[in-house]
Amino acid sequence: EHYGLSTKGTGDFMRELSAKYGYSDITQFLVEYVSVHPEVDHQVDEEQRIFGKENDNFVLDAHLGFHFVPDSIRICLICDLEEAARRILDDIERTTEDATNISDSIAASQKRRDTMQKNFMCLYQVDINDHSNFDLVLDTTTLSSVEAFERVSAFIDSRNT
């Protein structure tokens, strides 16, 4: 909003696909379906590539955005697994995870992350945990959303001057 940029999130696209394929839980969809149907990853990846070619000045919320839209400011937000799980549970708009407690949410988050890392390494030989792929890596575990935005915004502004 601050920069007036459009936002495209591949997570949103993946959630739409999971519902289309009859899954109410994104982790179950990733583990059971996407792992054995790589064409789903390719669908999402192609959408990223096309979006990057057809648009300028946008935000792409994507694990592999740095790979498919290389001419970009590449920012990675990281967070402690327990805090990330708590945030997922607290997000009332998020309806594609079945976890109802912190332990289940942590387990689902870890399983989802491990599955994505394995799939991306297998498909593209890209390690999503390699921070050298990014211009900025920011640990948001103890930051409010306002504090995280301020730090990211300062970094973006410093790159655009």
Task: Show which residues each predicted segment covers.
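Small-molecule kinase domains that catalyze NTP-dependent phosphoryl transfer to phosphate-bearing small molecules
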Residues: E97-A148
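Short, amphipathic alpha-helical "lid/cap" segments that border enzyme active or binding sites
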Residues: D45, S145-S153
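Short, well-ordered alpha-helix to beta-strand connector turns
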Residues: N55, D71-S72, F134-D135
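Conserved phosphate-donor/acceptor-positioning beta-strand/loop module used by diverse small-molecule
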Residues: D71-K111
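Short, hydrophobic alpha-helical segments
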Residues: I156-N160
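A conserved segment at the C-terminal end of the G1
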Residues: E1-L5
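ATP-dependent small-molecule kinase phosphotransfer cores
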Residues: K8-V69, E82-E83, E93-E97, D114
